[in-house]
Swiss-Prot record:
Organism: Chlamydia trachomatis serovar L2 (strain ATCC VR-902B / DSM 19102 / 434/Bu)
Catalytic-site annotation from UniProt: 138
The protein's name in its UniProt record: Serine/threonine-protein kinase PknD
Highest taxon of the lineage: Bacteria
Function statement: Together with the serine/threonine kinase Pkn1, may play a role in the specific interactions with host proteins during intracellular growth. Autophosphorylates and also phosphorylates Pkn1.
Similarity remark: Belongs to the protein kinase superfamily. Ser/Thr protein kinase family.
UniProt enzyme class: transferase
Gene (name only): pknD
GO MF annotation, one: protein serine kinase activity
Reactions catalysed: L-seryl-[protein] + ATP = O-phospho-L-seryl-[protein] + ADP + H(+); L-threonyl-[protein] + ATP = O-phospho-L-threonyl-[protein] + ADP + H(+)
Alphabetized UniProt keyword annotations: ATP-binding, Kinase, Nucleotide-binding, Phosphoprotein, Serine/threonine-protein kinase, Transferase
Short name of any one Pfam family annotated for the protein: Pkinase
Induction: Transcribed after 6 hours in infected mouse fibroblast cells, that is from the mid-phase of the developmental cycle.
Database matches in InterPro entries: Kinase-like_dom_sf, Prot_kinase_dom, Protein_kinase_ATP_BS, Ser/Thr_kinase_AS, Ser/Thr_kinase_PknD, TPR-like_helical_dom_sf
EC number: 2.7.11.1
Length: 934
């Protein structure tokens, strides 16, 4: 003890005393616990005291005070540990017992909301010691220390023991042989040889009967602690030797302290933990903690608000048959079928749970659950807001999530073939929708804007197969968002009131999430209000400037992207999203932008296919995990025609994989989105992927992006001596790529002889790429003879298979030179009109040009009128016969626009139109941007 100077006594128990001491060797304050002097001569108690110290020393957890040192030399038996400033849980509870009025500070400290995180920390510590095979056996508020800096630690391990300890039997034998003077011992607070272990008030009923301790005895003690935290009262007071009928006297916490606003389910958790029968308690601490998680996270508790009977018309405000709208998702059944539509009479809250069961047969033709804004629903606009569509086909359940008539998420899962009826639960709370089927989570969607749906709609054919619908609303959540009030105003389109409250919240919580979230929603409110009033949407931009550089900085650009989206400024929208994603890539709010990208992808698939490819590329690059395997197949079907019309996809016969660099290059090519090309080039170089490098050069060259082409050319030249391609690539050398690059540059500079010599040294694929890059320039500049010369030089040594790729260019030259006989022969031999020609194919356009040369304008118009897609590329080329098509180009993706302008120019030349007409298209092509952002 010479190393320690005792300062003062800070605690005393049945077996030991705890002092604040000064450690001279380390110059620090410590807590020193030593065995009481009057008990130090007892060998068994010394042994137990040391066991307590060793158990504490073996356990490493934030909720357990670590042991610095243990001493058992001579008569001195003690151990030391860190000194934690604070107070016991008992002292905190005692400070409010039987007090009618509490100070604001004490009321906050002892609120249910404040106590639950403390209780969870206690449980976490007990869960840890149980995992190590240790039972505490004396859990009580007196043994819970609350530090001044948030520490929550369990102390006093005197009663602790290993669950399967061999020494337990030895101690019991020792206890039988030891004589004790019970007059000197307060057995209510210590472990006594031959007596029941623990503090009677916190002991489980079975422990009082002498049953061996278990994890469930610790759970019982924790239940009593939780009970006290909830009620600020003890459920009963047990006297020594007195038997008590617990069931008659223990009131549930919600009845014991009704003024505490204890959620009923939380009250039930406490009662389950202190059940008399151990089998009725929680099976483990983990199960107890899981039961508490909804309250710790602020999740709501639900109470039934209304029960809707499907066949009872009085439950519904609107109850009529409807013809299923074509704007609902594509169904296995025909959308022309009639369905029953019901709109609830009762309004639903922002946090609502919908529960019902339905038969498999009732869902066979599909059924829908809709969350509709009241005003839109009353106007008959039944496809605003969110909706869910359920259908069963071939024992597979499919659930689609719809937003404003657009399918934004879809999931399918096999069902048990014998299953006749299944339960569906839908939770909608603020910005979250969760769908559970048979208690398993099926779909989870988070929208970072307040949901506007406050009416429930049902669409179903078979009313017999649907149970009553229970509508519940949340009550008693321990954490309610302060944004709920203005969100409610926004949902009712009371924009001015919503704006007032959003501003108040913003100003009340500076630097906190609530503040920047309120400002973001304020901006959305103003944007929506201006849009409804038909004003200038860009006025809403300034409201998002407030977020600049702050904790919610990414939301500035998300908000501005929303403004540009609604204003139709697609390029500016993409700029904002890209800036936020690049500058704040590690910011916790970035998932919101990723989710927004996903919504915009699905939204544009229905409204602006030309925009969809850009969002598809961004998601592949930034958040590929957002796209499911099922969606991959769907997207591959959408781009199939473009894939067939892409030269580097025609050359490489391997199927285009959705998650691949080639797909990213493909999307970059069609969208003109060149931002990712440098990274694709670097990646291909590192992988020594010859074909990928060639494809990237082709994309940069054919799109007219000379800056990128020269950048890659310089980079390739710098490493040409270092790169050697593997044998599997037929020993293709970087030199061939360099010849190709220099050959293309020679073509641009109109040094055609040099170009021919350089390209002669390259394989056919690179020659074909150079030919395709050059052919547009040749026709626009009317350098046809030079093009024919190069074409012939490549055609002559080519194989029959290779010549097939060149045939289109030969036909173009015949058409340009008005050689109808040769053009017709090649077209009719290889692409006869009596066969079904795909409208996206080059041959379809060339036939139109041939018919134009014959002078039969009626035949030209009839040919292009066959196009299935009214505003597709081929259809628009046909429209240029009678008028300009510039107003329709926004419906096309970037590369389609360029090719439409070029081919319209070519067609008008074949029609022998006036130079004034076809020159407009030529100039439009030449002036068109070389990439997405120019």
């Amino acid at each position: 003890m010479q190393r320690y100077e005792l300062i003062r006594l800070i605690g005393k128990g049945g077996m030991g005393e705890v002092y604040l001491a000064h450690d001279k060797a380390c110059s620090r304050r410590v807590a020193l616990k030593r065995i009481r002097e009057d008990l130090s001569g007892n060998a068994l108690l010394r042994k137990r005291f040391l066991r307590e110290a060793k158990i504490a020393a073996d356990l490493i957890h934030p909720g357990i005070v670590p042991v610095y040192s243990i001493c058992s030399d001579g008569e001195a038996v003690y151990y030391t540990m860190p000194y934690i400033e604070g107070f016991s849980l008992k002292s905190l509870l005692k400070s409010v017992w039987q007090k009618e009025v509490l100070s604001k500070e004490l009321e906050e400290k002892t609120s249910v909301k404040s106590f639950l995180p403390i209780f969870d920390k206690i449980c976490a510590t007990v869960e840890y010691i149980h995992s190590k095979g240790v039972l505490h056996r004396d859990l009580k508020p007196d043994n819970i220390l609350l530090g001044l800096f948030g520490e929550v630690v369990i102390v006093d391990w005197g009663a602790a023991i290993f669950k399967h300890a061999k020494e337990l039997k030895l101690e019991q034998d020792d206890e039988a042989a030891v004589s004790f003077d019970e007059r000197n011992i307060c057995y209510s607070s210590m472990t006594i040889p031959g007596k029941i272990v623990g503090t009677p008030d916190y002991m489980a009923p079975e422990s009082l009967l002498g049953v061996e301790a278990s994890e469930k005895t610790d759970i019982y003690a924790l239940g009593l602690i939780l009970y006290q935290m909830l009620t600020l009262a003890f459920p009963y007071r047990r006297k020594k030797g007195r038997k008590l009928s617990y069931r008659d006297v223990v009131l549930p916490p919600i009845e014991m302290s009704p003024y505490r606003e204890i959620p009923p389910s939380l009250s039930q958790i406490a009662m389950k933990a202190i059940a008399i029968n151990p089998a009725d308690r929680f099976s483990s601490i983990q199960e107890l903690r899981q039961a508490l998680q909804p309250y710790l996270q602020g999740d709501p508790e639900w109470t039934v608000k209304a029960t809707l009977m499907a066949k009872e018309k009085s439950c519904w405000k609107y109850y009529d048959p409807i013809l299923l709208s074509r704007y609902f998702p594509v169904l296995a059944s025909s959308p022309a079928q009639w369905y029953n539509f019901m709109l609830s009479e009762v309004e639903i809250s922002a946090s609502t749970r919908v529960e019902y069961t339905v038969t498999k047969s009732a869902v066979h033709e599909g059924m829908g659950i809709l969350f509709l804004p009241s005003k839109e629903a009353e106007r008959g606009e039944f496809y605003c807001g969110y909706g869910l569509w359920f259908s069963v086909q071939n024992h597979e359940l499919t659930v689609s999530l719809i937003k404003n008539g657009i399918e934004i998420q879809k999931k399918s899962q096999e069902m048990i073939s014998q299953q006749y009826r299944f339960a569906i639960l839908i939770e909608k709370s603020d910005n979250r929708i969760a769908v559970f089927v048979e208690q398993a989570l099926f779909i989870l969607h988070i929208d970072y804007l307040p949901s506007l749906g406050n009416r429930l709609g049902v669409i179903i054919q078979d009313l017999q197969g649907m149970s009553n619908i229970a509508i519940s609303e949340s009550i008693g959540a321990l954490r309610v968002s302060c944004l709920a009030v203005p969100d409610a105003f926004l949902s009712e389109k009371l924009y001015d009131q919503a704006a007032i409250f959003y501003r108040k919240i913003r100003d009340s919580f500076p630097g906190r999430k609530e503040s920047y979230e309120a400002q973001f929603r304020l901006g959305v409110t103003l944007l929506t209000q201006i849009e409804e009033q038909g004003g200038d949407l860009t006025q809403a931009l300034s409201s998002f400037d407030y977020l600049h550089g702050g904790a919610g900085a990414p939301l500035e650009y998300l908000g501005k992207a929303l403004v540009y989206q609604r204003n139709g400024s697609f390029v500016e929208e993409i700029r904002c999203l890209l800036f936020a994603l690049k500058r704040y890539s590690q910011h916790p709010e970035i998932p919101r932008l990723e989710d927004h990208l996903c919504f915009r992808l699905y939204d544009s698939l229905h409204k602006h296919r030309s925009e969809a490819l850009v969002f598809m590329l961004l998601i592949l690059w930034i958040a590929p995990e957002k796209i499911s395997v099922r969606e991959e197949k769907r997207f591959l079907r959408i781009i199939y025609h473009k894939q067939q019309a892409t030269l580097f996809c025609q050359v490489d016969k391997a199927p285009l994989q959705f998650r691949s660099s080639k797909m990213e290059l493909f999307l970059s090519f069609w969208t003109g989105f060149s931002l990712f090309l440098p990274e694709l080039f670097r990646r291909a170089g590192e992988l020594r992927d010859y074909q990928a490098l060639a494809d990237i050069f082709y994309v940069a060259g054919v799109s007219g992006n000379r800056e990128a082409f020269m950048q890659f050319s310089t980079a390739l030249a710098n490493v040409s001596d270092e790169i050697t391609f593997p044998e599997s690539l037929h020993n293709q050398k970087v030199a061939e790529l360099m010849f190709f690059v220099k050959g293309v540059e020679a073509l641009r500079n109109k040094d055609y002889q040099k170009a021919k010599k350089l390209l002669w040294k390259t394989p056919f694929t690179l020659q074909l790429y150079a030919l395709d890059i050059f052919h547009i320039q040749a026709f626009l500049d009317e350098e046809i003879e030079s093009f024919i010369d190069l074409l012939q030089a490549i055609y002559d040594p080519a194989s029959e298979e290779e010549r097939d790729h060149i045939l289109v260019y030969i036909i173009q030259t015949h058409l340009w030179n008005r050689d109808l006989e040769r053009a017709y022969k090649l077209l009719n031999d290889r692409f006869p009109l009596d066969e079904e020609l795909a409208e996206y194919s080059e041959a379809f356009i060339l036939w139109g040009c041939y018919l134009a040369l014959t002078g039969d304008r009626v035949a030209v118009k009839a040919h292009f009128s066959r196009c299935r897609y009214k505003y597709g590329k081929s259809a628009l080329i046909g429209k240029c016969v009678d008028g300009d098509i510039f107003d329709y180009l926004d419906n096309l993706v970037w590369w389609e626009k360029k090719m439409t302008l070029f081919q319209s120019y070519f067609l008008l030349r074949c029609l022998n139109e006036s130079p004034r007409r076809y020159e407009k298209y030529r100039q439009a092509y030449l002036s068109m941007e070389n990439n997405f952002f120019d």
